[in-house]
């Protein structure tokens, strides 16, 4: 009886591992590596340009990206780029007014990536933690980086393209974006 229970537990554990590995390989796509990416003239042009932010319309910081999104319902928007490492490499393209906003997040783990939309707000309501978020489906995406791995403090150069369906039914729309980005890994 104990051997039979042990076999069942072992089968459940192995089945779970196979399922998790399969889901990782299906959902997380491979990152393309282009070692010459950092030599592109667009990155040198970023150093000459200033990026306006919510707090400074003149722009005091050097431009970090030219990523922009177009969708069925709005004209293009320019995004800010933030790069963090904890334990996955997280690249966030964000637009907002300081109180609420959103954008797209690219999580990279061992040369595989996953794209997802995200949003934030300072108007938190009771039971917001139960909200699973808006429906989305990544129709197409591509991420190109200049190196295989990064540590905190490293410079990162990259390019991304994405096509995401957000919502469904009459509220469905397609958002498409692409652009180069650079920065330091925080």
Locations of the language-model features?
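Short, Lys/Arg-rich N-terminal segment immediately upstream of the first membrane anchor
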Residues: 1-6
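Targeting-peptide/extracellular-domain and disordered-appendage signature
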Residues: 23-26, 58-60
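Ser/Thr/Pro/Gly-rich low-complexity linker/stalk segments immediately outside membranes or between
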Residues: 24-42
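C-terminal or internal capping secondary-structure element at the end of a domain, subdomain, or sheet
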Residues: 146-186
């Amino acid at each position: 009886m104990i051997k039979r229970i042990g076999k069942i537990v072992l089968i459940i554990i192995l089945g779970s591992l196979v399922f998790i590995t399969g889901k990782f390989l299906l959902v997380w796509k491979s990152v393309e590596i282009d070692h010459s990416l950092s030599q592109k003239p667009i990155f040198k042009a970023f150093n000459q340009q200033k990026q306006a932010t919510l707090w400074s319309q003149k722009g005091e910081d050097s431009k970090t990206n030219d990523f922009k999104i177009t969708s069925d319902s709005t004209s293009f928007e320019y995004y800010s780029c933030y790069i963090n490492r904890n334990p996955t490499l997280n690249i966030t393209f964000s637009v907002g007014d300081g109180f609420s906003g959103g954008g797209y997040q690219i999580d990279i783990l061992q040369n595989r990536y996953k794209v997802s939309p995200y949003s934030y707000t300072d108007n938190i309501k009771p039971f917001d933690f139960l909200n699973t978020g808006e429906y989305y489906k990544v129709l197409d995406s591509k991420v190109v980086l200049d190196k295989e791995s990064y540590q905190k403090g490293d410079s990162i150069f990259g390019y991304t393209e994405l096509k995401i369906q957000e919502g469904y039914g009459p509220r469905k729309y397609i958002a498409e974006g692409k652009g180069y980005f650079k920065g330091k890994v925080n």
